[in-house]
Structures are given as structure tokens and as C-alpha cells.
Amino acid sequence: MRKSFYSWLMTQRNPKSDEPVAILADLAFDDTTFPKHSDDFEVISRYLEDQAIFSFNLGHFDAIWEDYLNH
């Protein structure tokens, strides 16, 4: 079974990094409503577009998702 996107994302946290994946990880860490148990692209993508309490350049999300799928 695949690890949830959030669980994988937390392994990418690095407050000193300017990499988009590290930025998203730090933002998601502070967001108590982030869908922590999901591994579904549509659920995560829709959340980031419509419900996230933070602003993130979604142009980077597809590449981050590909990294998640390939881990």
C-alpha cells in the first residue's frame, strides 16, 4: 500500500530550502485541514486549488506528484 501523499511530503520538509516540494511540505505541515490520509491526485489537487489556507504556485504540483509516485 502506498504511503499517503502527506506522509511522503513530510519527508521533504526543509525550512531552509527554496525547492517547491520543501515549500509545499512546510505549508502543509502547518495546515491542520490538509487531507493527511489521501493518496488520490484529485483529492489533493482540488484541496490545493479550492480549500488550502495557504497560497502555493500550483504550476509545481504536477512535478511534485510525479516525484511522489516514483518514490
Swiss-Prot record:
Cited Pfam families: YozE_SAM_like
Family designation: Belongs to the UPF0346 family.
| Name of the protein described by the UniProt record | UPF0346 protein SUB0487
Identify the species of origin: Streptococcus uberis (strain ATCC BAA-854 / 0140J)
